UniProtKB/Swiss-Prot annotation:
This protein's name: Uncharacterized protein C08B11.9
Domain of life: Eukaryota
Organism field: Caenorhabditis elegans
One Pfam family of this chain: DUF2452
Length: 186
């Protein structure tokens, strides 16, 4: 495209260009405020600003305190949960050290007895009402189910533990293809 005609015509030397400007406004129609108008400070404005700052500080302080209290409550709950875990672990370790003349199998209930006049404890598969004589009832200390993770659950807590396991199994089945096969490991 060879063309001798320029795309933009430039003014020749000495030629004036007229550009239309925005019309000026009168004094009472100003859009820009002058420095003299903004330098004026009203005492009521300062009080209102101080009140706003104080209110904002109180709000921030209140929110921070609420969050800290929530964290402190969570820490207390975690502390109690940790204590319960340690107590359960201590109980489980103690029960694993109790003599038993049979192989301990997960899912079974074992009954804990203490020999009369002795500190020796032992596990039996027989419940107190299955012994047939009164002495065994006096030596009975409690019944526990051996779980598949080798922890012990007191018989009184078995229903709660079973419900918890059932809820976890339902959750795992809803969440995807992962399903517990056989006996749970918790």
């Amino acid at each position: 495209m060879a063309s001798d005609m320029p795309l933009v015509q430039l003014p020749q030397r000495g030629e004036r260009i007229n550009v239309p400007l925005v019309q000026s406004r009168s004094e009472d129609q100003r859009l820009v405020t002058s420095a003299r108008q903004t330098d004026k400070i009203d005492a009521d404005d300062l009080v209102a600003l101080a009140n706003q700052l104080n209110s904002a500080r109180q709000l921030v302080k209140g929110r921070a305190c609420d969050r800290l209290k929530q964290i402190a409550d969570q820490m207390e709950q975690l502390h109690m949960a940790a204590r319960a875990v340690l107590e359960d672990a201590q109980r489980d370790e103690h029960l694993h050290n109790v003599p038993c003349n049979m192989e301990k199998q997960p899912g079974r209930i074992y009954h804990l007895y203490q020999k009369q006049g002795s500190m020796n404890k032992y596990f039996s598969m027989l419940a107190p009402n299955e012994w047939g004589y009164q002495e065994k009832k006096e030596e009975y200390l409690g019944s526990y189910r051996l779980e598949y993770d080798r922890s012990w659950t007191p018989v009184g807590e078995m229903d709660r533990k079973d419900e918890e396991v059932a809820r976890l199994q339902q959750l795992l089945q809803r969440e995807g293809p992962v399903a517990l096969r056989g006996n749970p490991n918790f």
